[in-house]
Amino acid sequence: MNLTPTTPVDDDNTEPGPFIELSRESWAVLSDSTEIDIDEATLDHIRGLGDPTSHRDVVEVYRPLTQLIHLYCMHTGALFDASNNFLQLTRHGMKRTPFVIGIAGSVAVGKSTVARLLRELLGRSPRRPVVDLVTTDGFLYPNRVLEERELLSRKGFPESYDRKALLRFVVDVKSGMPEVTAPVYSHVTYDIVPNQQLVVRQPDILIIEGLNVLQPPRRRSSGTMGLALSDFFDFSVYVDAEEADIIRWYINRFLTLRQTAFTDPHSFFGEYARMPDNEAITIAKEIWDTINGPNLVQNVLPTRGRATAILHKGPDHEVRNVWIRKV
């Protein structure tokens, strides 16, 4: 794991730092603390395209992570109750607001699979909480707006999102609004779906997955600092890997999509389905070099140190190390 000096994780662990590093083997031992599990059929449904996440990964990596998040959730609830008692708000019947989890990481690193796995596993934890999942793709500006602003070639960069709408969505959720809506995005048409909305109705846990969810606050024109999405997270996960591995996974996924989603007559990328493999690989590399790669280096990777947990994957897509922020 190549960590820059500015990242608050120590490569050699010889100096005290804000993170605890655990090898996969050490982390897997913690799996015995819970019996939460899923079957192969459910895992098949959850896995992303080309993602080789196995049942062994579920047991050794995601089960301990689920238990850790459950502990955070329980203690957050206890703190909420204690604070209400101290402030004498109990008589007002204030309801606890959703526990919000952010999942960040590069394109093609497998963060969507991690988000879906956690939704399934957390929903099976004690007390059977209601768990919703929202991706930030729905808060991308429609292609029409991106074209008007000459941002279509920067889709996925922070400025391509309606950040005010996304922040308002999370603020409303954390404020206890009974019903909050989010736009819906189609990976087939590569655009926002008109007249469709995802409705979130006070779940116990809300998972928000996206490239830039751990971005720090921006400075307003007045010079004051604004709010960041991550200000409202109770727990966050960064899915990490070496860029060379992510590029390879991205190209392989691109080639697979040519035989699946790209063949849909409504697909925005239909022309790629008819290309020879060598041309498709060239296009995929170009997209990475001009969009996904620069976005990773400039915007996504620098937020890694802001996460509560970092899952670092090896070349085979398996999590090799886990970093947990010290409480």
Swiss-Prot record:
Q: Please give the pathway this protein is involved in.
A: Cofactor biosynthesis; coenzyme A biosynthesis; CoA from (R)-pantothenate: step 1/5
Keyword Kinase included in the entry's annotation: yes
Catalysed reaction per UniProt?
Answer: (R)-pantothenate + ATP = (R)-4'-phosphopantothenate + ADP + H(+)
Q: Where in the cell is it found?
A: Cytoplasm
Where does this chain mainly localize?
A: cytoplasm
- Transmembrane regions: none
- Pfam families attached here? PRK (PF00485)
What does the record give as EC number?
2.7.1.33
**Per its UniProt record, what CDD domains does this chain match?**
PanK
> Molecular function terms in GO for this entry?
ATP binding; pantothenate kinase activity
Alphabetized UniProt keyword annotations: ATP-binding, Coenzyme A biosynthesis, Cytoplasm, Kinase, Nucleotide-binding, Transferase
Cystine pairs annotated here are none
List the Gene3D superfamilies hit by this protein, alphabetically. Answer: P-loop containing nucleotide triphosphate hydrolases
What EC class is this?
A: transferase
For this chain, the family text in UniProt reads:
Belongs to the prokaryotic pantothenate kinase family.
Q: What is this protein called?
A: Pantothenate kinase
Q: Which organism is it from?
A: Cutibacterium acnes (strain DSM 16379 / KPA171202)
